[in-house]
């Protein structure tokens, strides 16, 4: 019987995320917070919520709850866009910058520990396969 690849990948993501959540707990953040802050930090300044949701790969309503939490923590600010009152622009606060550096350290160290014993070539092969599978899925979705 073949391995249930989808289940295996889902389980890997779950345990990886749980470890990240555990390691970010002292910073009072979660993996979801990190992904959101990381993307805000990487994107050009004052992106809209729509652009951020696309960059992360989630629906905008799913993003709003996380943004509410980050705003409550004083890590981001949201302002109504002057050209489109329905759109909100997102900006990191000064309080977020040092925290992002701490988070990146935690994530980097955790990633290195997870990948210990895995060669650079194995990681490159895995990334290649993931991209290939993702493209196959996107192609199938486009056909449906």
From Swiss-Prot:
SMART domains the record matches: HTH_MARR (SM00347)
Entries under InterPro entries matching the protein: HTH_MarR-typ, MarR/SlyA-like, Tscrpt_reg_MarR-type_CS, Tscrpt_reg_SlyA, WH-like_DNA-bd_sf, WH_DNA-bd_sf
Any one GO BP annotation for this protein: response to stress
This protein's record includes keyword DNA damage: no
Annotated coiled-coil segments of the chain: none
DNA-binding region as annotated in the record: 49-72
GO molecular function, one term: DNA binding
Domain HTH marR-type: 2-135
The entry's keywords: Activator, DNA-binding, Repressor, Transcription, Transcription regulation
Described function: Transcription regulator that can specifically activate or repress expression of target genes.
Annotated family: Belongs to the SlyA family.
Subunit text: Homodimer.
Protein known as: Transcriptional regulator SlyA
Originating species: Klebsiella pneumoniae (strain 342)
Originating gene: slyA
């Amino acid at each position: 019987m073949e391995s249930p690849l989808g289940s295996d990948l889902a389980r890997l993501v779950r345990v990886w995320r749980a470890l990240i959540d555990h390691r970010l707990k002292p910073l009072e953040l979660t993996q979801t917070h990190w992904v959101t802050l990381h993307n805000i930090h990487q994107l050009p300044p004052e992106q809209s919520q729509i652009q951020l949701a696309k960059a992360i790969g989630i629906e905008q309503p799913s993003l709003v709850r996380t943004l509410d939490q980050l705003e409550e923590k004083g890590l981001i600010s949201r302002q109504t866009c002057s050209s489109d009152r329905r759109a909100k622009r997102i900006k990191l606060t000064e309080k977020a910058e040092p925290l992002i550096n701490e988070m990146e350290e935690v994530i980097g160290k955790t990633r290195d520990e997870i990948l210990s014993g895995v060669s650079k070539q194995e990681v490159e092969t895995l990334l290649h396969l993931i991209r290939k599978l993702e493209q196959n899925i996107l192609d199938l979705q486009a056909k449906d």
